Swiss-Prot record:
Cellular component, GO annotation: plasma membrane
UniProt name for this protein: Zinc import ATP-binding protein ZnuC
Binding site for ATP: G37, P38, N39, G40, A41, G42, K43, S44
Subunit structure: The complex is composed of two ATP-binding proteins (ZnuC), two transmembrane proteins (ZnuB) and a solute-binding protein (ZnuA).
Family label: Belongs to the ABC transporter superfamily. Zinc importer (TC 3.A.1.15.5) family.
Species of origin: Buchnera aphidicola subsp. Acyrthosiphon pisum (strain APS)
Keywords: ATP-binding, Cell inner membrane, Cell membrane, Ion transport, Membrane, Nucleotide-binding, Translocase, Transport, Zinc, Zinc transport
Limits of the ABC transporter domain: 5-220
Gene Ontology terms: biological process: response to zinc ion
Enzyme Commission number(s) from the entry: 7.2.2.20
Cited function: Part of the ABC transporter complex ZnuABC involved in zinc import. Responsible for energy coupling to the transport system.
């Protein structure tokens, strides 16, 4: 296993308010780490720190020299007055070509969408296109912000199956930010529950049994998660 990014005791303050306190984590090859927490917990700020978009007030960030990041945003804001095809959108990435674009679209099973208008894609189709675009630079770190938002259940299962295939093929680290606790607990290796600080972390089972996690999400919700995880502890074939 290889650490692509490591945070040590990272703190962020904005307008004299503590946003993140004493955050330490590692993003490791071939492992999926999922970040959960209530609104205002600092998840977006932590992602921006990891992406290098903002600097912390204190703490240490160590990135591997060969770090290459692929980012799938939570939502793509499109100007409906400026129609754009999937192919043209993919070409907005630097250092790409038609062969690479076709390869990535095929990899995410979206080659049939190449000449479609982005504005006409379903939620699941759009996520596949964003995923394909993120793969163009052969990332060793994939950051996925709410990847299942606006995607139906079958699409979510297929998307997580794809994520699992990609991480094994590329041996990349994957960070997922998600509110969908059901799929988080069934499809991730490690979980960090954030509420301006790290409330708890570890395997999904460990986090589900943590009192601070239960306090944030409620006992009933945690019990539902336990039932869901039990009923889905097997492999779906699509």
């Amino acid at each position: 296993m290889f650490e692509f990014v490591k945070l040590k005791n990272v703190c962020v303050n904005l307008s004299h308010r503590s946003i993140l306190t004493d955050i330490s984590l590692s993003l490791i090859s071939n492992r999926v780490l999922t970040l959960i927490g209530p609104n205002g917990a600092g998840k977006s700020t932590l992602v921006r720190i990891i992406l290098g978009l903002i600097k912390p007030n204190s703490g240490t960030i160590i990135r591997s020299n060969n770090l290459s990041v692929g980012y799938v945003p939570q939502k793509l804001h499109l100007n409906t007055l400026l129609p754009i095809t999937v192919e043209r959108f993919m070409k907005l990435s630097r250092k790409t070509n038609n062969i690479k674009i076709e390869e990535m679209l095929k990899r995410v099973k979206a080659e049939s969408l190449k000449f479609c208008q982005l504005q006409k894609l379903s939620g699941g189709e759009m996520q596949r296109i964003l995923f394909a675009k993120a793969l163009l630079n052969n990332p060793n770190l994939l950051v996925l912000d709410e990847p299942t938002q606006g995607v139906d259940v079958m699409g979510q299962l297929a998307l997580y199956k794809l994520i699992n295939e990609i991480r094994h093929e590329l041996q990349c680290a994957i960070l997922i930010v998600s509110h969908d606790l059901n799929f988080v607990m069934a499809k991730t290796d490690d979980v960090i529950c954030l509420n301006n600080h790290i409330c708890c972390s570890g395997t999904p089972e460990t986090v589900c049994n943590n009192l601070e996690f239960i306090s944030i999400f409620g006992l009933k919700r945690v019990q539902e998660l336990a039932i869901y995880h039990h009923n889905h502890n097997h492999i779906h074939n699509f």
